[in-house]
């Protein structure tokens, strides 16, 4: 009887200590982690057609390079708060993504968003996960080979992107005389060139290759010209959330050290997409260098 009672008291003490530890840890959480532990889930903003970063492929949840990285972040968040955190998905566009992060409607924005100084004043960013730049997509046989060929031509951009500003600024600076129109998303922008409404689609080169692959249109459309901007991508979260920043930075460093960033890149840029096609875009030396620099150095 004494042994049983002793074991019961020991078990009770251990349970109380565990509960106390969990409670203390919960009290130490702030920002997004505190919110996630309280509500029991993480809200992720995704894009519907940002191939291969964040997109819908048939039925089911969003997929893509950014989505896989965000799933790794959510797994780390679950471990940090001491409970499994399922994901709630919210579709965002180029125009709605920033306000959704700022307002707290979404916890992470997992798409194809450029980090720049203007946005960094309003939101936090993960370490760089990709480096792209603005180029032009045109139909086969188009006379357009570079930005200077856009005189009196209609160019479509996706509303709310850095590409929209880049094209406007270049047009104003060099007086090219192009006509710029804005579409809701990348799929709509692609469709405007396909229909003949626009003669070129200006966005990040990798997204152009993604749209061509998604539509099985290799040989029908080409990406041309020099880079018109520099666009490093990152995952957005609320500005000033230091706990989440540390967790995200650590997650990226661990993935870089285990070469998981490299494997995730190969999965989405060199292997077959859900459509069956490949983008076939080897990792640039610049991005490879960025990933290597993330590796945690031994103490």
How would you describe each model-predicted region?
Residues 27, 162-181, 219-221, 253-299:
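Ligand-binding clefts/hinges and TM-proximal coupling segments of bilobed small-molecule sensing domains
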Residues 29-31, 84-99, 142, 180-192, ...:
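Short helix-initiation/N-cap motifs at beta->coil->alpha
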Residues 43, 48-52, 62-79, 114, ...:
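Bilobed "Venus flytrap"/periplasmic-binding protein-like clamshell domains
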Residues 96, 111-121, 166-173, 187, ...:
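A ligand-binding cleft/hinge motif common to bilobed small-molecule-binding domains
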């Amino acid at each position: 009887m004494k042994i049983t009672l002793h074991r019961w008291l020991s078990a009770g003490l251990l349970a109380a200590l565990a509960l106390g530890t969990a409670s203390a840890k919960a009290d130490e959480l702030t920002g997004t982690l505190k919110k996630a532990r309280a509500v029991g889930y993480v809200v992720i903003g995704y894009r519907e057609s940002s191939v291969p970063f964040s997109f819908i492929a048939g039925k089911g949840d969003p997929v893509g390079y950014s989505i896989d990285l965000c799933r790794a972040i959510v797994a780390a968040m679950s471990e940090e708060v001491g409970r499994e955190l399922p994901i709630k998905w919210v579709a965002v566009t180029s125009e709605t993504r920033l306000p959704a992060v700022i307002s707290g409607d979404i916890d992470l924005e997992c798409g194809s968003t450029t980090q720049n100084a203007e946005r960094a004043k309003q939101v936090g960013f993960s370490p760089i996960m990709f480096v792209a730049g603005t180029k032009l997509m045109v139909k086969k046989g188009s006379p357009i080979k570079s930005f200077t060929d856009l005189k009196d031509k209609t160019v479509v951009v996706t509303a709310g992107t850095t590409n929209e500003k880049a094209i406007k600024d270049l047009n104003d600076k060099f007086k090219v005389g192009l006509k710029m129109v804005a579409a809701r998303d990348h799929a709509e922008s692609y469709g405007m060139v396909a229909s003949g409404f626009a003669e070129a689609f200006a966005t990040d080169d990798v997204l152009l290759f993604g749209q061509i692959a998604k539509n099985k249109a290799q040989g029908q459309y080409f990406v041309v010209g020099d880079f018109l901007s520099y666009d490093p991508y990152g995952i957005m979260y609320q500005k000033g959330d230091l706990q989440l920043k540390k967790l995200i930075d650590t997650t990226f460093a661990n993935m870089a050290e285990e070469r998981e960033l490299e494997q995730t890149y190969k999965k989405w840029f060199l292997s077959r997409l859900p459509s069956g096609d490949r983008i076939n875009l080897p990792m640039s030396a610049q991005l490879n260098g960025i990933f290597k620099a993330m590796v945690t150095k031994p103490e």
